[in-house]
UniProtKB/Swiss-Prot annotation:
GO molecular function: GTP cyclohydrolase I activity
HAMAP family: GTP_cyclohydrol_B
Biological processes, Gene Ontology terms: tetrahydrofolate biosynthetic process
Catalytic activity, as annotated: GTP + H2O = 7,8-dihydroneopterin 3'-triphosphate + formate + H(+)
Protein name per its UniProtKB record: GTP cyclohydrolase FolE2
Function: Converts GTP to 7,8-dihydroneopterin triphosphate.
Length: 256
């Protein structure tokens, strides 16, 4: 049969990335407490395309993913991208997996357990034999405005914020490590289950530890600086301001 994809392109221009996205894949990831956990990932796969080819072979991405059934780590990601490079005869391959990661978390006073879900992303780009691997997680925290507290006779405005951490490392890093760094950066952690005594604790703790969005991003960056395995990071914090019709944000990236 005619291979239309390998025919000459009418416009001889190279393409940085071409591929497939929104594939759904059962995934096993490493869990610090129980060893591993099963989740579902949304997957995007792509390669570069030289100027002289009309198109890429989309089915080969799906074939590579179907043949990949390893637990997610650096080596298994390396194997997936190596296979994509080979199948599509490309120079550069990229993969992104987004998935929920669940942790059972105790309420601070009652000790009642509730499931917290964190949005995680693993990205990889391979050129030749070199793989650049990035792990990311989004973690909700609570913030109380220091200015509002300082100028008010009673109370202060508080809100939820999201700390988005992305890292490159020398060796394996637990997702839990990043979650703990993020949760320690705000006025207080967020919990899925709170009884009255827990709610009292969270309220009092957060109001005794007011933080601007600037404080949160700096605290998270400092925690990442202290981690022995993290080589590079980017932290983005977005605060969903309760008294404004806009959000506040701050970002710090370690130079590469």
């Amino acid at each position: 049969m005619e291979d239309v994809q390998n025919s000459p392109a009418k416009v001889a221009m190279s393409i940085d990335r071409v591929g497939v996205r929104d594939l759904t894949l059962p995934l096993v990831v490493r869990d610090r407490e129980s060893g591993s956990q099963s989740t579902m990932a949304k997957v995007a796969l792509s390669v570069d395309l030289p100027a002289h080819f009309k198109g890429t072979h989309m089915s080969r991405f799906v074939e590579a993913l179907e043949d990949w059934s390893e637990e997610l780590d650096y080596q298994s990601f390396y194997n997936l991208l190596s296979d994509i490079l080979r199948r599509l005869e490309a120079e550069r391959a990229h993969a992104e997996l987004s998935f929920p990661y669940c942790l059972q978390k105790k309420s601070p006073v009652s000790g009642r357990k509730g499931i917290m879900s964190y949005e995680c992303t693993v990205e990889g780009e391979m050129v030749g034999d070199n793989l650049e691997f990035t792990l990311g997680v989004k973690v909700p925290v609570m913030t109380v405005c220091p200015c509002s507290k300082a100028i008010s006779d009673e109370g202060a405005h508080s809100q939820r914020a999201v700390v988005h951490i992305r890292t490159k490392s020398k060796g394996f890093v637990w997702i839990e490590d990043l979650v703990e760094i993020a949760e320690a950066s705000g006025s207080c952690e967020v919990f899925s289950l709170l009884k009255r005594e827990d709610e009292k604790h969270v309220t009092e703790k957060s109001f005794s530890n007011p933080t601007f969005v600037e404080d949160v991003v700096r605290n998270a960056a400092m925690g990442l600086e202290k981690h022995s395995k993290i080589l590079w990071y980017q932290v983005d914090v977005e605060s969903f301001e309760s008294i404004h019709n806009h959000c506040a944000f701050a970002s710090i990236a370690k130079p590469k």
